[in-house]
């Protein structure tokens, strides 16, 4: 299990409210909660809520509950419950013994529903879902009372108990709160509290065939658990009067209060569950953990460090108004963390063979390479140098422009940790493509410096042809080419270059043979992580992020 991390202390309007509540001795302990519905995978927007709620509980201190809002058995699966718990732990937080489910409270919620009926505050409605929707009115027109609104308490209790007993089919009846069909806030126009749903529940089995609505279950679950600050995103602001109405009318054991903050919106990103589901179902991505997905599973597979996500959430802060955050800020946080923690290795993504003609045939030597330039404790490793090497295709040009300083005919460059080499010949295939270079090396320049003081303007990475291993490299870019993709027609904004697969790459032998899932920097290329699709003899590495933002520049150029 992941060790809990220390919360980053940051000031915002929610923390200011909590501090004021503590200063006034309003609460002895702060209790927050993260309440996901187990009907899908968490995404980066949820990471903001997780870090906020768990961070507050650590900072003040207090406790944060993980509570699953499992009130819709048709959409909920154990797979999602497991993945959500794994995501919270991966992000660096732990709920300890405070794991709860809304279904834990089904009996009490039912009893309180009967309380509302007895108090004349709820009734059974026989209207269809469409009739209820139509009769609620609009923002400018009041709703119309249901013809069943004035049923007696006894009749409502009888019908509600028969609903619970399973006498009626799905959709035949609902239980509604009796509030005000002319209320300016449509959420107060007799909202549905219970609906009939004959479906197997992951935890309660077939014990229930009526299920509470989110609006009814949510606040009462908070009250049962002693939540002091119920923090949610802005789309629930209009639901707060209903939240408070239930708390006021029912004999709940505590009086929580709801606070709203701005949800996370990112450029080049859509977080709608509908869109993410379509992306998976329609085959635009290879599953919920596809590294292009904004899901936490996708980011974890891509090698994004959880510390980078926590830092990103800290930087964007907690606000009252919605805004769009440039994805470049997230990428900056990822690069900063990986630059600090990732060990360095060498990989050649598009190999071009080099033969060092004056290097003895059959001879090899071991050179020392540093694992991290800023962390001496990371140590060094041995890399093999020999007569035949690989360099990047892009590091050679036969007819280079004026400011191209890498390898070209007659030009000398430094091979990192090795020697100066000079290109003396070019071999092409029948199509005129360069397939091999002939070079010479200067034995006196071992380690990268010339005794005579001559300088070179380029240092290139390389690999031994004999000592390196084949690998598949997956270069991921933004899933959408449009910085503001259209959720209603997202397919039109998909980036056709979001994935490039390089099947003939080469990596250091130790990299190919290691099963480590820690991200590493392939020097001059970017940060990469071993993918779960790796097989014996054919490792697969996914790019977490490049060393610099090139995608935005390509988009700008059109």
UniProtKB/Swiss-Prot annotation:
SUPFAM superfamilies reported in the protein's UniProt record: Nucleotidylyl transferase, Ribosomal protein L25-like
UniProt GO molecular function: ATP binding; glutamine-tRNA ligase activity
Cellular component terms per the entry's GO annotation: cytosol
Amino-acid positions noted as binding L-glutamine in the UniProt annotation, renumbered to this chain: 69, 214
A Pfam family recorded for this sequence: tRNA-synt_1c_C
Keyword Nucleotide-binding set for record: yes
InterPro entries recorded: aa-tRNA-synth_I_CS, Gln-tRNA-synth, Gln/Glu-tRNA_Ligase, Gln_tRNA_ligase_bac, Glu/Gln-tRNA-synth, Glu/Gln-tRNA-synth_Ib_cat-dom, Glu/Gln-tRNA-synth_Ib_codon-bd, Glu_tRNA_lig_a-bdl
Motif annotated as 'HIGH' region, chain positions: 36-46
CDD domains: GlnRS_core
Keywords: Aminoacyl-tRNA synthetase, ATP-binding, Cytoplasm, Ligase, Nucleotide-binding, Protein biosynthesis
Positions occupied by motif 'KMSKS' region: 270-274
Catalytic activity: tRNA(Gln) + L-glutamine + ATP = L-glutaminyl-tRNA(Gln) + AMP + diphosphate
Subcellular location: Cytoplasm
HAMAP family for this protein: Gln_tRNA_synth
UniProt similarity note: Belongs to the class-I aminoacyl-tRNA synthetase family.
Subunit structure: Monomer.
Protein name, per record: Glutamine--tRNA ligase
Gene designation per UniProt: glnS
């Amino acid at each position: 299990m992941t060790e809990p991390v220390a919360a980053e202390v940051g000031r915002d309007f929610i923390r200011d409210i909590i501090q004021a509540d503590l200063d006034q001795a309003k609460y002895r302990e702060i209790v927050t909660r993260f309440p996901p519905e187990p009907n899908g995978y968490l995404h980066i927007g949820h990471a903001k809520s997780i870090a906020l709620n768990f961070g507050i509980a650590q900072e003040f201190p207090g406790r944060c509950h993980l509570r699953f809002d499992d009130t819709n058995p048709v959409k909920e699966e154990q797979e999602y419950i497991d993945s959500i718990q794994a995501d919270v732990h991966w992000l660096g937080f732990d709920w300890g013994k405070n794991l709860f489910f809304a279904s834990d409270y089904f009996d009490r919620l039912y009893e309180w529903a009967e309380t509302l009926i007895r108090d004349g505050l709820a009734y059974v409605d026989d209207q269809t879902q469409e009739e209820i929707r139509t009769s609620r009115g609009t923002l400018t027109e009041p709703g119309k009372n249901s013809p069943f609104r004035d049923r007696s308490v006894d009749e409502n209790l009888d019908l509600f108990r028969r609903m619970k007993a399973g006498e009626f089919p799905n959709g035949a009846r609902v239980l509604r709160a009796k509030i005000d069909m002319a209320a300016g806030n449509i959420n107060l126009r007799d909202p549905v509290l219970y609906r009939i749903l004959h479906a197997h529940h992951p935890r309660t089995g077939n014990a229930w065939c009526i299920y509470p609505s989110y609006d009814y279950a949510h606040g009462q679950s908070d009250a049962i658990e002693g939540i002091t600050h119920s923090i949610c995103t802005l789309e629930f602001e209009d639901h707060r009067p209903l939240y408070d109405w239930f708390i006021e009318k029912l004999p709940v054991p505590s009086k929580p209060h709801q606070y709203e903050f701005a949800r996370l919106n990112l450029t080049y990103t859509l977080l709608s569950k509908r869109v993410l589901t379509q992306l998976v179902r329609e085959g635009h991505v290879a599953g919920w953990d596809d590294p292009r997905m904004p899901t936490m599973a996708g980011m974890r597979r891509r090698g994004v460090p959880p510390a980078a996500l926590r830092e990103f959430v800290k930087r964007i802060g907690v606000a009252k108004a919605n805004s769009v955050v440039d994805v470049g800020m997230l990428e900056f946080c990822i690069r900063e963390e990986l630059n600090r923690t990732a060990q360095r290795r060498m990989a050649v993504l598009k190999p071009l063979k080099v033969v060092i003609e004056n290097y003895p045939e059959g001879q090899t030597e071991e050179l020392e390479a540093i694992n991290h330039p800023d962390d001496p404790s990371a140590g060094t490793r041995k890399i093999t140098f020999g007569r035949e090497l690989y360099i990047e295709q892009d590091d050679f040009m036969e007819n280079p422009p004026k400011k191209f300083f890498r390898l070209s005919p007659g030009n000398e460059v430094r091979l990192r940790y090795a020697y100066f080499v000079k290109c003396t010949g070019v071999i092409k295939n029948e199509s005129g493509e360069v397939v091999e270079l002939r070079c010479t090396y200067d034995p006196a320049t071992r380690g990268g410096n010339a005794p005579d003081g001559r300088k070179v303007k380029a240092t290139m990475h390389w690999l031994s042809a004999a000592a390196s291993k084949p690998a598949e490299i997956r270069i991921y870019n933004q899933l959408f080419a449009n910085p503001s993709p259209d959720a209603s027609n997202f397919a039109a904004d998909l980036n056709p270059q979001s994935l490039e697969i390089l099947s003939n790459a080469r990596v250091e032998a130790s990299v190919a043979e290691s099963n480590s899932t820690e991200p590493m920097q392939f020097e001059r290329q970017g940060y990469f992580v071993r993918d779960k699709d790796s097989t014996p003899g054919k490792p697969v590495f996914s790019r977490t992020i490049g060393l610099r933002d090139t995608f935005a520049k390509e988009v700008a150029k059109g």
